[in-house]
């Protein structure tokens, strides 16, 4: 915990400075117009932290790699489903990360799953305010938030070729499923930070190794149950990471999750404004986040 606080202090320096900076941006061989280039998502990692054994964990991006690494099929064995698209795979029965592969075996998206038994008994979480994008998986008695990296309506129809996977990597866009029909109920998270201007995405703080945070319709006097479960992260003006959250303390057998500190000072490193309810909510019910990184070496490159 002390190390986490130390790193948080370092992040505060970046938050206070709010200056786009990276130690590699002054490297003489770096591209001068990298900020204008399209994001290239060349990896898929989850988990933020200071422990190298449990943070920035690389995930397989092909079904064959997943099988080699011990991932197993989860639920139905067909690609197209009623409430999501893709062949689902899970590692050691931990629903914190459920990978979705297209019909050809290439990464197509991922889900964060939370078992009902791990949530408050009064069923207050997730709240109606965020249902959807939280969608109930009644077959497994859990709640899911689903993101896709390619168009959902292509995942189980044509999928991607090996050439397309090599060219685009993890994907080209970030889609958030916002209803029960995965092929039609989704929004696309803006790929460029400039496209958030004039929207209800509230700019937050820059935190080194993560990026510039944005939170949907964040307000000081909001109810914490309204906290939107996805927050995008931008570096050099481009989307290259995002986070998922739920307002409860939930376990992850494979150590995927992060547990924010119940402190306004801590939340000020990421949010502006900080909702008044957040410290007490975290003390009473907890808070769980999952960071997802789409480009290599976030420790070195994600400096906003």
PLM segments and residue spans:
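Cleavable N-terminal signal peptides of Sec/SRP-targeted secreted and luminal proteins
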Residues: 1-16
